[in-house]
């Protein structure tokens, strides 16, 4: 019998079913002493259901850190553990799973608070973990309102978890914490210096990490091996306030991108913006296994120890799931990253390439909309002199971006051909000033839509691809791709997940009052409208822009279809809760409210936009900088009248209460400038730094200030 088979057989034989009647401790039982040193990441619970919950810990013997360690799990109705419902011995925290252990406990009672701890026995002592507290979901017929916090994006590097600290101060009576992604960030601290050595991320095996060139002589390491990803979770879970939140509340967690790789899709990273191939399935599987080891997830219907190694991983991963909390809440936790296709505009798209030619525009009745000279194009193969100049310019730019001369030449031949937009080609030809290869007259030339018309200016860049794309032209292109691919180009959730979600929304399947979809990215449309800004220079910048098309703005037609289903199949009792964008939003999108929680600690979107706008050549004091950075919140509201509330310069969390008549939402916000202040040493000052904004979500898709 193989060691692997033996281990799995043992795990499957362990069943953690709570006793129906509480029992007490034995009179001769030795006391449990403080054993926190054996539980460096403390304890956690997750995926609460009416009759079950998953309990988690990481147990390590400091004197034998590479050895498996035997653990006992005790669950009780009281903090003193006098009324126990479970005492499970013989559990093993295995080194092969980084000493993590998670146990699904069943046969519990609905909406009941339980206390739990893990115990290690050594040298006659019983050494206990911190005591955890959890709560099961209410029974299906319970009318009790359900309360939960929404959180996301908790970069650890040089930043403090003041938001978690504040949640603990408030002592909210929550049924669970919903964490909608970016629990860890895949990068080490190489490029993010921290004066506090306790807020640094380092890899124990840096040689197995992936170097990432940030430009300007800056480099960082990003997780690649299983060891790297485990290091991230161990480090993040070392934070005392994150530990306390896990000790107090059960979590429901879904990943976004940074648990694997920034702006990822499927198993593809996007660090090099198309300069190199970044399909990384083994790296993806490593990221998933570490996530499964450290997150208490309910993965099947059975009871007992959960073996992360047995959980399906890429390409067979499934973490989307749903929860019922009484009569009023059905929660659908969706996975936006695993099944989604590539971003519609490739990061390495040649800006001049015509994506929709004159024939396509004519077939859609759009010829008149693109009649201006700016949309003129030619078949560059009919202009060999100009083609040679454009290819030479491509090679020069590509080599400057890091490609070899040979690779750049091959790409130039493959891309600089066929229909090319003069809006991009002519300025290049003008600058080259080669005799006999000057700019081409647009008069009489066909009109088409090229990537340059959507904001793509550089050969390899996220700008004009994943970020800051011109809305009106992008929408045309996205709709055409949607229709010609039978929806596949925008199938963000994948066919199976979407079918599951829509099936659960069928009449009679989900009788709960409110249907809440948890999405790691926001459905709120985030638009910068600079069209009527005469002080914006140059005039070519006066467009409407999507701030990010890595989120649902990048799949506008699929979003419309999904929101229509949510709206129509719930009788107006649908709600989306989301994160990712590092800002707080409350909006109504096509009749469906969306509450986007701010980041716990990651850089606020206003800060990120400021750096990007400056890098694009618009310094502070310029009109562009003023509109999209200084006055960013107002610009977002102007671009989307459905936005009821926005704060782009704050951290925090959102507390949601779901009742029979309405959903209440309280945004607890801390200025982003406070993220580098350690309020752990001055807790009395923290409350004064927070503000609160309250809203009510009502049936039919309305959001009002409370």
Question: Residues of each region from the PLM?
Answer:
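N-terminal secretory signal peptides and thylakoid transit peptides that target proteins
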Residues: 1-18
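Long, structured stretches of catalytic cores involved in phosphate-ester chemistry, encompassing
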Residues: 26-104, 108-706
